[in-house]
């Protein structure tokens, strides 16, 4: 049995995503497709345009069999943390055999070479990397320039977002000693960061920008039928669109904090705590705040992620433990009729417990502890980390719904109100 694993955000699902999914299926010819998807917040440090259940529905309508949620602790980290979580979820299903991801270079051999270099760092690389950090470069840029110095060739492959993420996926496969085989598909269409609307193969960034500018009807060109229909439903009922600009209220929260309060939160080092502390006292909105914090070593994405690290109380110790031990559960968001068959196989093969009903997450943990004690499974579950990871997912949902355009839709408890999306027709 071949099971294809893909890592997605679908913010929102567009024709470029559909192309990737169809090409991945042609490449692997899988029996099933499993997606691990960011929940209500995405890796660039932004809220998803619609909630995770709507995006799960879109994924299932377009050919995915099972959708798992990427815990928010990983979803709002840099490429390395994001990959540790997403590959961790796919590996811990116990059934995924292949992972396919987009790549600007289309050169999986080169990506493997870089991943191995970063995993087993040479003294030459470490020295060069530290030198670039001291020069004031951000972590990702310092690493890129160090790799360019060491490898000398193929430098353009180290600056593209999909290739960078692909390297991190392979590093994560190495860390987990995973049997999952990596494959790449050469990326087509607009660049990930291109906000110019270009018809059928516009980027997700361009689609979101068009929606923000009240040009939703125009996005029909770039969106499969079911994506447009479901977005239209969510928007009409006031459950979207949700944008980063809606989070101005965090400035007031930051003004309550002392500098040392920021220091205990993940990603606050290199003076970022002081810049947050001072900028909160000078800024009138979130956009102004981000611009004041911006510096050579702090990318916009890092600043935005740090905002949510504070908002979700992401303590350094628990995030670092999450990166060390990986996801402690598999949260099912939705499945098709075929996906239901695969979930049955997963229950026999998974390396961590599976959560289908959010309200029963503690019961699932107790049942897992019982199975471990009886020797029925060989899982290694960190009880406090399991609870911390899942309760951060719950908190992220509760904060997300507060930003819905329709105030009557803003109540907490999304994860308990929504059932797993079952598409059995």
Curated annotation (Swiss-Prot):
Which major enzyme category is it? Answer: ligase
Q: Which residues bind ATP?
A: 7-20, 102, 162, 187-188
What Gene Ontology cellular component terms go with this record? cytoplasm
Q: Where in the cell is it found?
A: Cytoplasm
Instruction: Cite the InterPro entries for this sequence.
Output: Rossmann-like_a/b/a_fold, tRNA(Met)_cyd_acetate_ligase
The EC code for this enzyme is 6.3.4.-
Name-wise, this protein is: tRNA(Met) cytidine acetate ligase
What is the gene called? tmcAL
